[in-house]
Structures are given as C-alpha cells and as structure tokens.
C-alpha cells in the first residue's frame, strides 16, 4: 500500500480492522452491494468484516478456516478499535455474495447484522437495546448479541420469504430502520421490505416493494433524506436454462452462465414519503401501495430515469448518493478500466466524492465534483496504490463532519497473500 502518488487531499490516517482472508478465491470484505459495512452513530464508528483470526503466514489454507464475522467499534475521532469476534458461527462458503451487512436503529440503539447469503436461509442477529445509544457504558462482547437466527423478531416463524435470501440491506428510516432482502435468483426475483420499529423492537413486513416479472431488480442504494426513502435500481432479464425450475438447482450460484450482467438494462428510480408503504415515481405519481398488496413492477409508468439497453456494460449494484437538493444530474467522468464498482458520497457542503478502484494497477482514486459547479466536472484529488476490492464509505460521517472514511482492502507490497481490512480517514 502506497499513499503518496497523487496528493491534493491530506495524507489519510490509516487504521487496521483485521486480517483479510487472502486464501479465498472470492472477495468477501468490500463489495458494492454492502449498503453499510462502516457506520458512524453518536460519536462512535462501527465496521463489520470477515476474518479467520489466524496468522497470514500460515502455509496451509485449511488452518485459516473457518472465517468469523467480526465487528469493530471506536470512539471518534481516533480511539483504538475494539473487536467482537462472533466465533459461534463458522463461515465456510467461498462466494463473494456472502458478505456481512450492518444496521443501527436510531430510536432504540440496537445493532443488527445479517450475513452469509446467496439464495440461503436467513442468518441474522441483533444486539440488546441501547448498545449504540450509550456506547460509553455498554460492554462490547458477543453476549450482548443474540445467536444466529433464521427469522427477525416480530415476523412469525417460519416465514416463507426467509428461505432464499440474498443481498440483505439495512438503513435508517427516521427513528426506525428498514431491512430489505432479495427473494429469488439472478434474473428471477423480488425485493422485500421490512420495518424495524424502535418503539416495539419488532419487525413488520411492509411488502414486496420491487417485483420482478421475468427479471429481477438489482438495487444501487436506498437512502433516507428529509422524510423520503429514495431507491434506484437496474433490471436484469431472465434467460431460461435447463433445470432453472428445479428447487435444488444451484447453477445460478456459480457466478457464470446466461443470467449475467449482459442482461442488465435501464436505471430506474422511485421514492416513498411515508416510510416505505407508498411508492411514487420521479413525476410524483403514486405507483405502488404496499398496504394494499401492491408492488413496483417493471411496467409501472415513469420508472426509467435513464434508458439503457442490454449489452451496454451496465453493471448492477453500482452506487447511489442523494444530495440536499435531490435533483438528477448526468455527467461523464471518462472511461473506467474494469467492472469493479465504486462509491459515491456527499460532503457537508454538498460536494460529491467518487471513490473508484482500478484493479489493473491495484489503485484507488478519489474524484471530487463541486456542487457550486452543478457537479459538471470531476477532479482527481487523491490516488493510492496497493488496494483491491470495492471501496465502501461512512456516508454519515462525511456529511456531518467532512471526514471521508473509506473501508478498503490493503495489499502488502511484499506478498499478495498478506491483506488487511483498513479504514482510510481523509479530512477534506
């Protein structure tokens, strides 16, 4: 890792969360569809990742198994990280979909985790109340969390939607918190929305907010701002193959085959101003009432923000950021050398930061687009080498403190098998 190639931002402060499992073929720490692997709340920062908790010098890969969910916290701005290792759950599947997701409910201070899914039974755990609200007095041990559950509190068990889960996602919803999942397979699935109510500590099934019809939505992001929950997504059309309707079929898990990203099309947008129950298009027209059993379907009017045909290199689950004005803009930033996905984030002053990886030279670069210039120009303000994976960002800290915290994987200059999960802090 080298931090001094291009330097218009100050040198970042780099802290280590833990060892990355370099022996795995797939990257598990740092994927674009992790909505929040790093979050700030009430002056503390939290991060989640997988690690084997063993030495990177071990020659036998079997000694580095299994992996464990790890959760770190620190008091901002610069206290030491404190770590919980959830060693009661063994992660053994080498599949890049099976990441860790985290959410914090503002109203009751609970922390929620969901992990290790690619069309699998739900895996979920949560903390006791108040652990994030009063971190100074809350002990940081695994026994303040539940064991791994296959349901969420408040939803009758067994629940038909929790048997085929991918892409869990948590996010703030005012005083409450939302939880969304995909139910189905690549090209053939729906997105479902649950609401965790702080007042009761229970979840409510709000409904199927995105319904696929011979396709499935891939969500770029879900962001809550000024009473509105914003969502963007692409669709992926489904291509039938032998055995697609077999309940035991696993071909769709192999990250190859006919239902890949070549079938992605269109960038779509909708929002809800009543906490996820009623959805409107960009023209403020109601298109789905979840309380009445409705869903946003591909044929709903006014969904398409940008019309992009199949086969144009449109990648699923890219990035989304909602600025204070909530206006669409479109500007080219030049070609990118690979399909690795980046991140978008808005600063305290409304400027846009683009964090872009380049695996062709193991670099990470940061571009800045000024709000004052209507985001028309993107200027590179930092570049470093020795990074891999897809960067993640603590969006809340940037917007509230003008500190850009980037979650990334740093690769040793001497050995590609020596990788660390790190946080880079830039004072912008």
Give residue spans per PLM region.
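Extracellular, repeat-based ectodomains that mediate carbohydrate processing or recognition
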Residues: 1-428
């Amino acid at each position: 890792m080298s931090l001094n190639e291009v330097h218009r931002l100050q040198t970042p402060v780099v802290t280590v969360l833990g060892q990355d499992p370099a022996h795995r073929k797939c990257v598990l720490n740092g994927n674009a569809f992790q909505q929040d692997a790093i979050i700030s709340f009430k002056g503390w920062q939290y991060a989640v990742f997988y690690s084997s908790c063993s030495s990177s010098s071990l020659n036998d890969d079997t000694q580095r198994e299994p992996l464990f969910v790890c959760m770190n916290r620190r008091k901002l701005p610069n206290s030491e990280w404190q770590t919980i290792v959830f060693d009661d759950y063994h992660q053994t599947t080498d599949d890049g979909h099976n990441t860790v997701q985290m959410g914090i409910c503002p109203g009751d201070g609970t922390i929620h985790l969901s992990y290790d899914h690619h069309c699998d039974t739900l895996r979920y755990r949560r903390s006791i109340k108040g652990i994030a609200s009063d971190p100074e007095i809350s002990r940081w041990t695994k026994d303040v969390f539940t064991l791994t559950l296959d349901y969420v509190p408040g939803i009758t068990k067994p629940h038909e939607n929790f048997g085929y889960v991918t892409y869990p996602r948590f996010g703030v919803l005012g005083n409450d918190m939302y939880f969304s999942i995909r139910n189905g397979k690549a090209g053939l699935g729906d997105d479902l929305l649950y609401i965790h109510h702080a007042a009761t500590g229970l979840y409510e099934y709000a409904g199927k907010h995105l319904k696929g019809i011979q396709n499935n939505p891939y969500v770029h992001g879900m962001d809550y701002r000024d009473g509105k929950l914003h969502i963007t997504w692409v669709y992926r059309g489904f291509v039938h193959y032998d055995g697609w309707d077999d309940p035991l079929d696993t071909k769709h898990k192999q990250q190859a085959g006919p239902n890949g990203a070549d079938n992605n099309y269109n960038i779509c947008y909708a929002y809800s101003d009543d906490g996820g129950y009623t959805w409107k298009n960009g023209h403020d027209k109601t298109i789905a009432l979840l309380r009445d059993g409705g869903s946003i379907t591909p044929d709903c009017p006014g969904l398409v923000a940008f019309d992009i045909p199949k086969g144009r290199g449109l990648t699923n689950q890219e990035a989304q950021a909602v600025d204070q004005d909530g206006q669409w803009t479109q500007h080219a930033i030049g070609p990118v050398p690979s399909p690795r996905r980046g991140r978008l984030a808005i600063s305290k002053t409304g400027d846009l930061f683009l964090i872009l990886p380049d695996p062709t030279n193991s670099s990470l670069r940061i571009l800045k687009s000024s709000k004052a210039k209507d985001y028309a120009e993107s200027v590179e303000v930092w570049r470093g080498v020795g990074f891999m994976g897809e960067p993640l960002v603590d969006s809340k800290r940037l917007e509230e403190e003008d500190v850009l915290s980037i979650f990334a994987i740093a690769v040793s200059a001497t050995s590609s098998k020596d990788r660390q999960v790190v946080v880079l802090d830039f004072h912008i």
